[in-house]
Amino acid sequence: MIENLRKRSTIEVEWRKQPVHMDIDLDQVDNPEAYPITVSVETSKDGSDPGLLWQPMHAERDSIVKETIHAKYVLGCDGARSWIRQRLGVSFIGDLTDSTWGVMDIVPKTSFPDIRKVAVIHSSKGTVMSVPREDKLVRFYIQIDAVNPNAASGLARRDLKVEDLLDAARAIMFPYTMEAAECAWWSAYRVGQRVANEFARHDRIFLAGDSVREYCLEVIRCQ
């Protein structure tokens, strides 16, 4: 997709930039020719990841490059911990559950025969959903609390490790085996069914995807 953008337009996709400040000029929002939104972003000089949006910047401050972007529109697709949603002060409406799930992108070593297909596995230990991705990666959504009841507490979630996700997947998928030759990314979260109380601000800043709604993966039990 990115290569097609380069061939067919002047659009360039940039990575590893972290927003740190955003302002909107209310006097210009109704002017279709204006660029009323100012976003300040930071990146490291060597192009490495300057830090996760919900964690302190881990790069040295003297290695950070600052940039100011003037935009007509901003689209926030930055996930459940959306920086843009938080910056706008938009809140979620709905309920959290006591169900804790893990998600991981791994290169699996498994005896499960349909690993390169979208699959949903139910057992007495819980639910696992697998979705094939690029470069031999597979994304796994894993119901952790069914195997580890203590995972429902916030403190326990912070203590979880990728090995805990693998242990839960193994228990649910038994007698199939499961190992990770490589782990590209993982996370754990308490699921809920919530939606943002606002999707757009001044028809200039928009929220989409996980930044605007949460849903419980347990609905797959009913499908």
Curated annotation (Swiss-Prot):
GO terms for molecular function: FAD binding; oxidoreductase activity, acting on paired donors, with incorporation or reduction of molecular oxygen, NAD(P)H as one donor, and incorporation of one atom of oxygen. FAD binds at R139, F140, Y141, Y189, D210. Its EC number is 1.-.-.-. It comes from the Eukaryota. Pathway: Secondary metabolite biosynthesis. The keyword Flavoprotein applies. It holds the Pfam family FAD_binding_3. Induction: Expression is down-regulated by ralstonins, lipopeptides produced by the plant pathogenic bacteria Ralstonia solanacearum. Expression is positively regulated by the imizoquins cluster-specific transcription regulator imqK. Keywords: FAD, Flavoprotein, Monooxygenase, Oxidoreductase. FAD-dependent monooxygenase; part of the gene cluster that mediates the biosynthesis of imizoquins A to D, tripeptide-derived alkaloids that serve a protective role against oxidative stress that are essential for normal germination. ImqB is a canonical three-module NRPS that assembles the tripeptide backbone of the imizoquins via condensation of Trp, Tyr, and Leu-derived precursors. N-methylation by imqF and phenol oxidation by imqC, followed by cyclization via the FAD-dependent oxidase imqH carry out the three-step transformation of L-tyrosine into tetrahydroisoquinoline. Belongs to the PheA/TfdB FAD monooxygenase family. This is FAD-dependent monooxygenase imqC. It comes from Aspergillus flavus (strain ATCC 200026 / FGSC A1120 / IAM 13836 / NRRL 3357 / JCM 12722 / SRRC 167).
